[in-house]
């Protein structure tokens, strides 16, 4: 994997990256593991802040489980679960999952807002665009999804993840609010904040929410990916899985499956490696997972790239992290072709 290692070296030397763990696999077989670090080398069990990958590893997967169990329907309105005004009652579960609720990224750090009542604050955010008209990436929408899940199942989100996902998949090192005795790669500027979620909305809510908060490692993420390669088994049935991986926003600016990014010509961060119809997701802290369900190829990238860029530039350079993903995927493509 000389091209991939050369790409990593360039980003480290430029100060855009300190720690990274990459796994390249195909059809359940690991093709390569790459670990690099400016100080202590991470391993396959080192914990990373998964950031928005929480949306697919936890929240949308729990919804697919709920749909599979006939507990909820994609066309259910949010008004079935919480009081809403006339406009917001048009929002469906599908709108929430594919980011078409009309509300973009917003801070929920308000006096009086807390874990128990955050849904009311989300439902009172003014719309940026009409519901269902466009994809606007929405962390508030996924925070609301987390609260709906808790109402549907009668359990807190972290407990639902453990019982319905982590336990069946034997994911032993994936947690919300993990114990500080674990080995982490820090996603925060301050050393004393290691092991604390980076996302400010999730941190404000105590480290557990539908948009972020999960910490995981290469081995556990691989188990999640293997489940996807097995068409959802053992978590959901094949029919539910096939429903989940369709492109629901083809005519909009971003293509979205149920929770997942749907890779097509509009999406750049997978480079030339992944074919149209591949699925995946990114995390703002520097993480990504992508899977080509037809070929069985997958790539997991866990890193501290965003924190490294924040240290160098003082923030505001997520474009560098996005370009890093594109470059790494292209380098992996070259290495696989050379093998």
At which residue positions do the language-model features occur?
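Short amphipathic alpha-helical segments
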Residues: 2-9
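Short, gly/Ser/Thr-rich active-site loops of penicillin-recognizing serine hydrolases
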Residues: 230, 239-240, 245, 265-268, ...
């Amino acid at each position: 994997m000389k091209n991939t290692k050369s790409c990593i070296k360039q980003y480290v030397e430029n100060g855009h990256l300190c720690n990274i763990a990459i796994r390249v696999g195909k059809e359940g077989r690991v093709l390569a593991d790459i670990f690099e670090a400016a100080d202590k080398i991470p391993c396959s069990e080192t914990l990373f802040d998964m950031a928005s990958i929480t949306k697919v590893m936890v929240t949308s997967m729990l919804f697919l489980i709920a749909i599979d169990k006939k507990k909820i329907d994609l066309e259910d309105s949010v008004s079935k679960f919480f009081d809403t005004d006339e406009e917001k009652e048009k929002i469906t579960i599908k709108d929430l999952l594919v980011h078409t609720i009309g509300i973009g990224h917003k801070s929920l750090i308000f006096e009086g807002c807390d874990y128990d009542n955050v849904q009311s604050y989300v439902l009172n955010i003014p719309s940026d665009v009409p519901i269902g008209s466009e994809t606007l990436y929405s962390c508030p929408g996924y925070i609301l999804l987390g609260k709906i899940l808790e109402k549907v199942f009668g359990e807190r989100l972290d407990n639902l993840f453990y019982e319905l996902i982590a336990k069946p998949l034997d994911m032993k090192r994936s947690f919300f609010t993990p114990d500080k005795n674990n080995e982490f790669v820090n996603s925060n500027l301050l050393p004393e904040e290691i092991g604390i979620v980076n996302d400010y909305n999730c941190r404000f809510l105590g480290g557990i929410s539908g948009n972020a908060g999960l910490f995981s490692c290469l081995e556990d993420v691989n188990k999640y990916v293997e489940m996807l390669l097995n068409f959802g088994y053992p978590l959901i049935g094949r029919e539910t899985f096939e429903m989940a991986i369709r492109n629901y926003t083809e005519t909009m600016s971003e293509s979205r499956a149920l929770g997942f990014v749907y890779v097509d010509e509009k999406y750049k961060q997978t480079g030339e490696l992944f074919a149209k119809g591949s699925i995946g997701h990114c995390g703002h802290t520097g993480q990504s997972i992508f899977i080509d369900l037809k070929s069985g190829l997958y790539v997991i990238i866990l890193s501290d790239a965003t924190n490294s860029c924040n240290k160098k530039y003082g923030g505001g350079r997520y474009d560098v992290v996005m370009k890093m993903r594109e470059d790494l995927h292209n380098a992996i493509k070259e290495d696989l072709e050379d093998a």
